[in-house]
Regions:
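Active-site beta3 strand of CheY-like receiver
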Residues: 6, 47-53
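Active-site residues of response regulator receiver
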Residues: 9, 55, 83
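Two-component/phosphorelay signaling modules centered on CheY-like receiver
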Residues: 12-32
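Acidic catalytic/metal-coordinating carboxylates
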Residues: 35-39, 62-66
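Receiver (REC) domain active-site loop signature in two-component systems and cognate sites
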Residues: 58
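Alpha4 helix (beta4-alpha4-beta5 surface) of REC/receiver domains from two-component response regulators
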Residues: 65, 78, 85-102, 109
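Conserved alpha-helical "signature site"
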Residues: 108-288, 292-366
């Protein structure tokens, strides 16, 4: 069965151009082209749509409003905005409801690749309930103290972009949304940004203020919303994993770009847990209580209860948001690194090893994928990595 893709644009010439440029995908996609939001919603009422690609500026109902309505009615549909207008108000209006932003005119190959990637992510998460769960998520929860800190600092006229970048780099939810926005086609960057501090410097303080203070991107965490899940504990582990993964890349390759990717991957590697904990608080709380001693038991319990584990959910969600592919892969596969086709040291390697070493602690034995490390010819490096992370003063 072919995937259904719906294109929406009120300009007839643009719509015709899309039809011509996407003609080569007719054997793989069922495509429908409509010229207004009402027609799009009418079509979706009778046809399941996998991906919707909408123009931003349209009469009656603009693209941001349309995708907001699609998110409410059909949360599993992947939502893409196609526009030539880098208007800040419109960007902020659609941050929550849009998975990715594409600029007009959009290179046909980029559009095809983006839609194909979205479909590939969807195929990896077949569970209907989780598809709907992830599709509805506008934000990942943020630690209250960090949220309060960033708001307070923004009211201080002496606060710099670097100050805000440091705060955002400590927070899972803020990092994910800021990276989603700065990597959108609206900003026209020629490379993907993986560093929160660099993203803040590029977006500017006014945009960051609008994002945070309008609550389009972030929300405060309700401490009593879950029983066993602790966002503070997750933050602590995620920060440690991020720093450790970055350090491993520095030791192995000293590649600045990969160091940034490894840091963000480590910071977000357990982001899927927030989706499960926030949407199934009682059920997930019980699972956490029953599987405290073993990550393998946790993965099995998640799979039995939800049809996917937290790594699947996190990778799917952040992939939809358009984070760099190495980051998405590291998040999705950090418990199953052998599933990657890569045969070299990547951010996935760093996060997998860092997570295992930190979970084991000084007295434990890291539970790593030995077959994967053997394939990379890196198995003999494990003890050295462990020494580097747990005893940095004595490591070489």
């Amino acid at each position: 069965m072919k995937n259904q893709v719906l294109f929406v644009d009120d300009e007839a010439l643009i719509l015709q151009g899309l039809q011509r440029s996407m003609r080569g995908m007719r054997n793989e996609w069922d495509m429908t082209f409509v010229d207004n939001a009402a027609a799009a919603l009418a079509f979706m009422a009778t046809h399941p749509v996998d991906v919707i690609v909408s123009d931003m500026r349209m009469p009656a109902m603009n693209g941001a409003q349309l995708l907001g309505e699609v998110m409410k009615r059909y949360p599993r549909t992947v939502r893409l905005i196609l526009s030539g207008h880098a208007d800040q108000d419109l960007i902020l209006q659609c941050v929550g409801s849009t998975h990715q932003f594409l600029s007009k005119p959009c290179d046909p190959e980029q559009l095809r690749a983006t839609v194909c990637r979205a479909m590939d992510l969807e195929s990896k998460l077949k569970n209907e309930r989780l598809q709907q769960l992830v599709g509805r998520m506008e934000h990942l929860p943020s630690v209250p103290s960090l949220y309060s800190e960033i708001v307070d600092r923004m009211h201080d006229p002496e606060t710099t972009l670097e100050d805000i970048g440091v705060i955002i780099a400590k927070d899972i939810g803020m990092t994910a949304k800021i990276l989603k926005l700065v990597n959108s086609a609206f900003f026209g960057l020629r490379r993907q940004v993986a560093s929160p501090a660099e993203a803040v410097a590029y977006l500017g303080l006014d945009t960051i203020k609008s994002l945070v203070l309008s609550m389009h991107a972030f929300s405060q965490f309700e401490p009593d919303q879950t029983n066993a899940f602790s966002i503070s504990r997750l933050w602590d582990h995620s920060m440690q994993t991020a720093a450790a993964a970055k350090r491993l890349v520095q030791v192995e390759l000293n590649d600045r770009k990969m160091m940034d990717e490894a840091f963000v991957s480590g910071l977000l590697h357990d982001a899927g847990k927030t989706a499960l904990a926030f949407n199934f608080p009682d059920q997930y709380g019980k699972i956490l209580e029953q599987t405290r001693a073993s990550s393998a038991d946790l993965l099995r319990a998640e799979l039995e209860a939800f049809g996917a584990n937290h790594a699947d959910v996190g990778g799917y969600l952040l992939g939809l948001w358009g984070l760099p592919t190495p980051v998405v892969e590291a998040i999705a596969l950090h418990h199953q690194p052998a599933l990657t086709s890569a045969n070299t040291f990547t951010p996935l390697t760093a996060v997998h090893v860092a997570n295992a070493i930190l979970n084991a602690g000084p007295a434990g034995t890291p539970v790593v994928d030995a077959v994967y490390l053997e394939r990379l010819k890196l198995a003999d490096r494990l003890n050295g990595w462990r020494e580097t992370l747990l005893n940095p003063a004595t490591a070489e």
